[in-house]
From Swiss-Prot:
Transmembrane segments: none annotated. It comes from the Eukaryota. Its main location: other. Residues 569-589, 607-770, 783-802 are annotated as: Disordered. SUPFAM superfamilies: BAR/IMD domain-like, GTPase activation domain, GAP, PH domain-like. This is Oligophrenin-1. The gene is OPHN1.
Length: 802
C-alpha cells in the first residue's frame, strides 16, 4: 500500500493527520535504513568469509527478498514495477548460484558497500538531521506560543509587541524547518528506488561475470539487466523532472502558503483554544478545528485527551459568530460563537489577530481572503501568431540543429529567450523576427519554444482531458493505453489537435536522429510531458503524476503514424487495437521463472595461453580455449555475434522508428555503471542517462580477475542450418553481438498461436524448424528478433503493422 503524498500546505496547518502521515514516512525511512544496514552487513560477510560463502549468499538473498518498496501515489509506472520486483529476482538468482560456489571479486566492496553506505549516511542521515531540527523548532514554537497566549492583555503595549515579534519569528523558523523536512523525506523516499537498486545491480553483474562457472547464468541475466538498467535510467529521468517541479512548488509555497487549497478541503482549519467553565474555575482547552462554510459545520477535535477515555471529534452547527470585546476578557484574539447543539456562548481564542480575522471572515459568510495571488509569468495564447512562432522554430531546428547533441535538454540563456519572445510577440509587429540571425542559436530557439508551450493559458492537451490521459497511461493493459490515448487525442479542440500533431511530428523527426542527438522517445517524453500536459492545481500529488504525463508523450511519439492516420472508430468506449488470444498486459521482467539448464563441466585454462587459440563467443566476452567444442547442446539457442561484423545471412539489428526508418539501437553498458560506482559516484552522467555514448564500446574493468574456462557446447538453432553455427571461427574474426532493442517487450509467457503468422527472415538461413519447448531458448530467440519490432514497453504493441 502506498503512502499518501505530503502536501507542503499541510506544513502550515500541522494537523494531527499530517503528523500521522509524517510518522508513516519516518517509519518507512527507518525500515529502509535498517534494510541498508542489513545489506551492508551481509555483503561484508559475503566478501570476507570465503569459507562460509554459501550460507552468506543465502542470508543475503533472504534479506533482499524480504524488502518491498513502498511508493508515493496510487500507481507505479512499468519501470517502477520492474524496480519494485527487482530484489525478488536478485534473490532467486543468488539461490541458484549458491551451489556453484562462485568466487567473490576483490572490488565487491566498492560496488556494493560504499554506495549504500554513502546513501545511508548522506541521504538518510541528512534526513534524520532535518527531523531533529523540525522537532526542536516545533517544540520551541509551541512552548513559546503557549506562554504567549497566556499573556494578559493588560501588559504594556511594547511588551506585547515584542512577544508578537518573537512568536512570528519562531513560527517562521518552524514552518521553514517543516517544509525542508517534508521535501527531504519525500526526496529520499523517491530516490531510494535507484540509489539502492543500482549498487546491488552492479554488484550482481560483477559477481556473475567474474567466475567462469556462471557463464550460462550470465547469458540469461543480460536481457533482464539491460531492461532493468533502462528502467532505472527512465525512473531517474522522471525523478529529476519531478524534483524540479517540486522545488518550484516549494518556492511558491514559501511566498504564499495558502495558495494550494484542494477541492473538498474545509474552508478554514487550524488550532483554537476553547474556554471551558468548571465549578472550580475556568480552563482553556486546545482543539483542532475545521469549518465548512457551505454547511456551517464546525468540527472540533480535542488535543488534550482525558485519562481513561478517548474523545472523538465534535460536530457543531454554527448559528452566528461575533468578535469578543478586548475589555471584556483578559485573553487576546478571542471571539464568541453560538451553535445549535450547545446552549449559551462558546468563547474561542485564535493564535493571532490575523488568524482571528480569517476565522471571522469564514464564519460570518464574507468572502474569504486566504492568500495574496502569486505573480505569474505572462500567459501565452494558442493563436495564429503562436502557430507561426512554433512553425518557424521547428523549421530552423530541423534545418540547422536536428543533430545537435542534447537537443531540447540543453537550455539557452534566459535573457536571449526573453528577448526573442518579446520581439516575436510584440503587439506592434508580431512575428517580425529573422530566425536566421546569428543572435539566435539553437539552444535559445528550443528554450523559447518550450517556454511558449509551457506558459500557454491552457496546456496543449487541455485541463479537461488531463485526468483521462493520466488514467490511460496508468493502465497495465498495453492495448488499452494506445486505444484510449488515440481516442482522447481526437477529443481535443481543433487548434489544440493541430498544434499537437505539428509538435509530435517534429519530435518524431528529432528521435530519428537519436544516434547523433541522443534524444530517444523516452527522453523527449521527460522534456515535453510537463510542457504539453500539466495539472490545474499545484500540489505534490499532481507532481507525482508527471512520470505518467511523460509516458503519454512517449506513446504519441512512438505510435504517431497509427494515431494520426485517422480518428478511431466511433464507439462508446475508447477503441482497442485488434484483439489477441489473451489481452497483453504489462508484467515485470523476470529471469527466475525460466527452466534450469543442465550445466556443462568447465575446466579452467591458464592465463598464459596464446592468443591464436579458438575463440567462442558468449554475451559477456570471449572464452578462449584450444579444445574443439563438442557438438549438440541440451537446449537450442540463437547464435551470438559481435557488433561490427557483417553476416550475409542476417541484417544488422536496428531500432525501427514510426515512419519506417531504421536506426541502430543503443547499448546499455553496465560496465560504465560499475566504473562509476567504483569511483564512489552515485550520479549517472547526462550522456549515460539520455542515451548511448557515440563510439562507446564494451567497457572492461581491469580489477576483475576472470579465469578463462574451457569451452562449453555450442548451441544449434532448430530453425536454421545447424552446421552454420558449429563452425569454428578464424582467430582474427570477431562475431557480432545481437543486442535487444532499447525498450524490449515483455518476455514470452504463453505459447499462443498468432492470428497472422509472419515469416521470420534474417534469423537463420534455411527452413524454420519446430518450436522449442525451452523457455530460455524461446526468450533468447525473442530478443534476437525483437529489434525489428517497433515501440517500447510503455505502450508497444508487437504485431501492429500500422
Amino acid at each position: 500500500m502506498g503512502h499518501p503524498p505530503l502536501e507542503f500546505s499541510d506544513c502550515y496547518l500541522d494537523s494531527p493527520d499530517f503528523r500521522e502521515r509524517l510518522k508513516c514516512y519516518e517509519q518507512e525511512l527507518e525500515r529502509t535504513n535498517k534494510f541498508i544496514k542489513d545489506v551492508i552487513k551481509d555483503g561484508n560477510a559475503l566478501i570476507s568469509a570465503m569459507r562460509n560463502y554459501s550460507s552468506a549468499v543465502q542470508k543475503f538473498s533472504q534479506t533482499l527478498q524480504s524488502f518491498q518498496f513502498d511508493f508515493i501515489g496510487d500507481t507505479l509506472t512499468d519501470d517502477e514495477i520492474n524496480i519494485a520486483e527487482s530484489f525478488k529476482e536478485f534473490a532467486e538468482l543468488l539461490n541458484e548460484v549458491e551451489n556453484e560456489r562462485m568466487m567473490m571479486v576483490h572490488n565487491a566492496s566498492d560496488l556494493l558497500i560504499k554506495p549504500l553506505e554513502n546513501f545511508r549516511k548522506e541521504q538518510i542521515g541528512f534526513t534524520k538531521e532535518r527531523k531533529k531540527k523540525f522537532e526542536k523548532d516545533g517544540e520551541r514554537f509551541y512552548s513559546l506560543l503557549d506562554r504567549h497566549l497566556h499573556l494578559s492583555s493588560k501588559k504594556k503595549e511594547s511588551q506585547l509587541q515584542e512577544a508578537d515579534l518573537q512568536v512570528d519569528k519562531e513560527r517562521h523558523n518552524f514552518f521553514e524547518s517543516s517544509l525542508d523536512y517534508v521535501y527531504q523525506i519525500q526526496e529520499v523516499q523517491e530516490s531510494k528506488k535507484f540509489n539502492i537498486v543500482e549498487p546491488v545491480l552492479a554488484f550482481l553483474h560483477s559477481l556473475f561475470i567474474s567466475n567462469s562457472l556462471t557463464v550460462e547464468l550470465t547469458q540469461d541475466f543480460l536481457p533482464y539487466k539491460q531492461q532493468l538498467q533502462l528502467s532505472l535510467q527512465n525512473t531517474r529521468n522522471h525523478f529529476s523532472s519531478t524534483r524540479e517541479e517540486m522545488e518550484e512548488l516549494k518556492k511558491r509555497m514559501k511566498e504564499a502558503p495558502q495558495t494550494c487549497k484542494l477541492p473538498g478541503q474545509p474552508t478554514i482549519e487550524g488550532y483554537l483554544y476553547t474556554q471551558e467553565k468548571w465549578a472550580l474555575g475556568i480552563s482553556w482547552v486546545k482543539y483542532y478545528c475545521q469549518y465548512e462554510k457551505e454547511t456551517k459545520t464546525l468540527t472540533m477535535t480535542p488535543m488534550e485527551q482525558k485519562p481513561g477515555a478517548k474523545q472523538g471529534p465534535l460536530d457543531l452547527t454554527l448559528k452566528y459568530c461575533v468578535r469578543r470585546k478586548t475589555e471584556s476578557i483578559d485573553k487576546r484574539f478571542c471571539f464568541d460563537i453560538e451553535t445549535n447543539e450547545r446552549p449559551g456562548t462558546i468563547t474561542l481564542q485564535a493564535l493571532s489577530e490575523a488568524n482571528r480575522r480569517l476565522w471571522m471572515e469564514a464564519m460570518d459568510g464574507k468572502e474569504p481572503i486566504y492568500h495574496s495571488p502569486i505573480t505569474k509569468q505572462q500567459e501565452m495564447e494558442l493563436n495564429e501568431v503562436g502557430f507561426k512562432f512554433v512553425r518557424k522554430c521547428i523549421n530552423i531546428i530541423e534545418t540547422k540543429g536536428i543533430k545537435t547533441e542534447g537537443l531540447y535538454r540543453t537550455v539557452g540563456s534566459n535573457i536571449q529567450v526573453q528577448k526573442l519572445l518579446n520581439a516575436f510577440f510584440d503587439p506592434k509587429c508580431p512575428g517580425d523576427v529573422d530566425f536566421h540571425n546569428s543572435d539566435w542559436d539553437i539552444k535559445t530557439i528550443t528554450s523559447s519554444l518550450k517556454f511558449y508551450l509551457r506558459n500557454l493559458s491552457e496546456p496543449v492537451m487541455t485541463y479537461r482531458l488531463h485526468k483521462e490521459l493520466v488514467s490511460a497511461a496508468k493502465s497495465d493493459n498495453l492495448d488499452y493505453r494506445l486505444g484510449a490515448i488515440h481516442s482522447l487525442v481526437y477529443k481535443l479542440p481543433e487548434k489544440n489537435r493541430e498544434m499537437l500533431e505539428l509538435l509530435i511530428r517534429h519530435l518524431v523527426n528529432v528521435c530519428e536522429h537519436s544516434k547523433e542527438n541522443l534524444m530517444t522517445p523516452s527522453n523527449m517524453g521527460v522534456i515535453f510531458g510537463p510542457t504539453l500536459m500539466r495539472a490545474q492545481e499545484d500540489t505534490v500529488a499532481a507532481m507525482m503524476n508527471i512520470k505518467f504525463q511523460n509516458i503519454v508523450v512517449e506513446i504519441l511519439i512512438e505510435h504517431f503514424g497509427k494515431i494520426y492516420l485517422g480518428p478511431p472508430e466511433e464507439s462508446a468506449a475508447p477503441p482497442v487495437p485488434p484483439p489477441r488470444v489473451t489481452a497483453r498486459r504489462h508484467k515485470p521482467i523476470t529471469i527466475s521463472k525460466r527452466l534450469l539448464r543442465e550445466r556443462t563441466v568447465f575446466y579452467t585454462s591458464s592465463l598464459d595461453e596464446s592468443e591464436d587459440e579458438i575463440q567462442h563467443q558468449t554475451p559477456n566476452g570471449t572464452i578462449t580455449s584450444s579444445i574443439e567444442p563438442p557438438k549438440p547442446p541440451q537446449h537450442p539457442k540463437l547464435p551470438i555475434q559481435r557488433s561490427g561484423e557483417t553476416d550475409p545471412g542476417r541484417k544488422s539489428p536496428s531500432r525501427p522508428i514510426s515512419d519506417g526508418k531504421l536506426e541502430p539501437c543503443p547499448e546499455v553498458d553496465v560496465g560504465k555503471l560499475v566504473s562509476r560506482l567504483q569511483d564512489g559516484g552515485t550520479k549517472i552522467t547526462p550522456k549515460a542517462t539520455n542515451g548511448p555514448m557515440p563510439g562507446s564500446g564494451p567497457t572492461k574493468t581491469p580489477s576483475f580477475h576472470i579465469k578463462r574456462p574451457a569451452p562449453r557446447p555450442l548451441a544449434h538453432h532448430k530453425e536454421g542450418d545447424a552446421d552454420s553455427f558449429s563452425k569454428v571461427r578464424p582467430p582474427g574474426e570477431k562475431p557480432t553481438i545481437i543486442r535487444p532493442p532499447v525498450r524490449p517487450p515483455d518476455p514470452p509467457c504463453r505459447a499462443a498461436t498468432p492470428q497472422k503468422p509472419e515469416p521470420k527472415p534474417d534469423i537463420v538461413a534455411g527452413n524454420a524448424g519446430e518450436i522449442t519447448s525451452s523457455v530460455v531458448a524461446s526468450r533468447t530467440r525473442f530478443f534476437e528478433t525483437a529489434s525489428r519490432k517497433t515501440g517500447s514497453s510503455q505502450g508497444r504493441l508487437p504485431g501492429d503493422e500500422s
